[in-house]
A protein has these predicted regions:
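Short, glycine/acidic-enriched loop or turn micro-motifs at the edges of active sites
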Residues: 7-9, 142, 176, 198
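H/E-rich (His + Asp/Glu) clusters that bind or coordinate divalent metals
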Residues: 174-218
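Active-site phosphate/pyrophosphate- and oxyanion-stabilizing loops and adjacent acidic/basic residues
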Residues: 68-72, 158-159, 184, 209-210
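Mid-domain alpha/beta scaffold segments of enzyme catalytic cores
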Residues: 1-124, 128, 186, 193-195, ...
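Short helix-capping segments at alpha-helix termini
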Residues: 75-77, 163-167, 188-191, 215-216
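Divalent metal-binding pocket/active-site signature
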Residues: 58-61, 86-89, 101-184
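Hydrophobic beta-strand segments of well-ordered beta-sheets in folded domains
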Residues: 49-51, 135-136, 168-169, 192-194, ...
Length: 218
């Protein structure tokens, strides 16, 4: 079975303009049209059995609608995680609702949420999510939106690991996009997962293999 653990999709009515915005930031064309149907078609072409869809909540006001959309995809070929913003004061209630909706985890994106990952607000969310058995996925390392101001560095992630000791934390992009020397320094061997999203064309192959060998693979 092939699982693509890092994908994105949006409601049909906003998918087009959302992709236009993101394509401008990334300077690249998307593989699909940003919809559920487009993602499924792309999965078929790549022989992918299951995709995990990861939403990015950029405003507190988006939380309810994003999680409502995500709740329609708790099983089948596309499994969506929920989302939360670090400025949500009622984060415990939101996380319980995410759990009750049948969602298996949450996605955090410090760059788009304009907060550094070692902020106590993130630590509280991750701790509460861990207590509920939810997986937490975090964008880690350089993002084209603000490449000179990284909001989740491997060093920040290590602090969160030491402070919170979460059971199911996933750092996207092999622990820190374009910061893989620091991934080796601070994160390899720790109780944390890495995904391989958007790194295979930029990460040195020998370093990728070394990290996989040293950290382990599931």
């Amino acid at each position: 079975m092939i699982i693509d653990f890092h994908t994105h999709m949006f409601p049909d009515k906003i998918a087009g303009r959302t992709l236009d915005y993101l394509s401008g930031i990334f300077g690249a064309s998307p593989f699909a049209d940003g919809t559920y149907t487009g993602l499924c078609n792309s999965m078929g072409k790549g022989a992918v059995d299951i995709s995990i869809a990861l939403p990015a909540v950029t405003k507190v006001s988006q939380v309810a609608s994003i999680n409502r959309f995500a709740s329609a995809y708790t099983e089948g070929p596309v499994i969506s995680f929920g989302g939360i913003h670090p400025e949500c004061e009622n984060y415990k209630e939101i996380l319980k609702e995410i759990k009750n909706l049948g969602l298996k985890g949450i996605k955090l994106h410090p760059d788009y949420q304009d907060m550094y990952f070692d902020n106590i607000r993130y630590e509280r969310i991750i701790d509460a999510a861990s207590e509920l058995g939810l997986i937490t996925v975090v964008h880690a390392g350089v993002d084209p939106k603000c490449p000179e101001d990284v909001h989740c560095t491997p060093k920040m992630a290590r602090k969160v690991l030491d402070d919170v000791k979460p059971e199911k934390l996933v750092l996207a992009h092999m622990g820190g996009n374009e910061m893989w020397d620091d991934v080796e320094r601070y994160l390899v061997g720790q109780n944390v997962y890495f995904d391989t999203g958007v790194i295979l064309n930029t990460m040195p192959q020998e370093q990728f293999l070394r990290i996989v060998h040293m950290h382990g693979a599931d």
